[in-house]
Amino acid sequence: MLKIYEDIINEVISRLEQVEDEVSIGKSAIHELRNEWRERLIEYTQSEWDGERMRRRDGEQGYHGYERLSEGPAHAFGGKPTTAKDPGMFEDYGSSDVSSGDSEIIGTKGSTGNCMVCLYVKVNMSKGKWKCTFKQGFISIGNIDFVFNSAQGELEW
């Protein structure tokens, strides 16, 4: 399942890089977003593995067919995960007013709760509700992940 998440993150980042001038997103904001997603994915998968270990010790049925690699999930992206604690991580990008409110939009670090990552096809507003059509994504509710090819939803804002 980790490979699916990695592919979706890479696809979203590559599309953002292609249209960065049109949507007014700087390279630094894109890199910060990618790093934040990777950190959260690593934290989520580590907590999922820890929970799985506890379930198997208690004798409950867990996921079948999963094997934990000896390197751990942190190496799934090809190296040590970058964190904001690493010295000099963002010194090339400098401070930017554009991304100053990203932590409010993305949320605070810690428990990610429920999340959905996907591509959108269209968004319409009708009768005070946003009607959305999504494609190629996954939704994580609790500890259960659902992969979907297309989805529709109504949102009240």
Swiss-Prot record:
Pfam families: TFIIA (PF03153). It is found in: Nucleus. GO terms for biological process: transcription initiation at RNA polymerase II promoter. CDD domains: TFIIA_alpha_beta_like (cd07976). Its main location: nucleus. Keywords: Nucleus, Transcription. One of its GO terms (cellular component) is transcription factor TFIIA complex. InterPro entries: TFIIA_asu/bsu, TFIIA_b-brl. It comes from the Eukaryota. The keyword Transcription applies. TFIIA is a heterodimer of the large subunit and the small subunit gamma. Belongs to the TFIIA subunit 1 family. TFIIA is a component of the transcription machinery of RNA polymerase II and plays an important role in transcriptional activation. This is Transcription initiation factor IIA large subunit. It comes from Encephalitozoon cuniculi (strain GB-M1) (Microsporidian parasite). The lineage of its organism: Eukaryota, Fungi, Fungi incertae sedis, Microsporidia, Unikaryonidae. The gene is TOA1.
